[in-house]
Amino acid sequence: MNGPGNKDIIFNDLYLDWSAPVTLVEGVFDAIGAGDNSIPILGSTLRKDSKLFQKIADKGVSVYLALDPDAEKKALHIARSLLEYGIEVYKVDVSPYKDVGEMTKEQFQYRKKKAEIVSNDTFLLQAAQSI
């Protein structure tokens, strides 16, 4: 569960390139596996009032969502929130792995290249598939 201070933290902010797409993952080890410009959200939720969400919205960078398969509904909620702010969102298929940390960097990069764009048109279809 997210602690009260997590919404005010952007993990590794000083090392992020805010002019390039970012990858959102759940934990620190997932971020290591995902490579450069990856941000652990330190849980499976990203609230609109969090510092990270606000910075993404302010910078307008594309987002690759690579949350654990058991957080599919939460990933779709995050995607919908980002879409409301005009952010381009891609969903990285992590299954059948438990999380990004179980993959090699090469496996993750391959899946990232194959990521599906999430749009208002495809959101309902992807939400239905997650049921």
Where are these predicted regions, by residue range?
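Phosphate-handling DNA/RNA-contact segment within nucleic-acid enzymes
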Residues: 1-61
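Replication-associated primase and helicase/ATPase modules
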Residues: 22-24, 54-66, 75-131
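Short, charged/polar "capping" segments at the starts of alpha-helices
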Residues: 49, 71-76
